[in-house]
């Protein structure tokens, strides 16, 4: 089972969890306590050298970091329902909303 390194309450892992739920994908949640700086431990830095959460660890041990690339990976595994858009306009519109959230809204949190 794929593992999602998470910190409860953090917005980026929450995005991945919502996405996985919509896809009916079960992920093992691994709490990485940022208050204790577990995300900066040598073990975690092997999974993601930037020391950021979320990280998706695949069954073969490879890791994907950042919420959008993780969601795109999950989309490729389970294409229905399509959550990234089906035509050029939908894809562009969804991408623009994602960028707005990342650059305008979450920078204020």
Explain the meaning of each model-derived region.
Residues 1-109:
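GST-like domain detector, emphasizing the conserved glutathione-binding G-site
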């Amino acid at each position: 089972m794929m593992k999602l390194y998470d910190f409860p309450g953090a917005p980026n892992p929450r995005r991945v969890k919502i996405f996985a739920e919509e896809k009916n994908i079960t992920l093992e949640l691994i709490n990485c306590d940022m208050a204790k700086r577990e995300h900066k431990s040598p073990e975690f830095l092997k999974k993601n050298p930037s020391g950021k959460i979320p990280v998706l660890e695949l069954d073969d041990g490879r890791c994907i970091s950042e919420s959008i690339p993780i969601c795109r990976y999950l989309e490729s595994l389970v294409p229905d329902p399509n959550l990234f858009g089906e035509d050029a306009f939908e894809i562009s519109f969804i991408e623009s909303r994602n960028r707005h959230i990342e650059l305008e809204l979450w920078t204020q949190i």
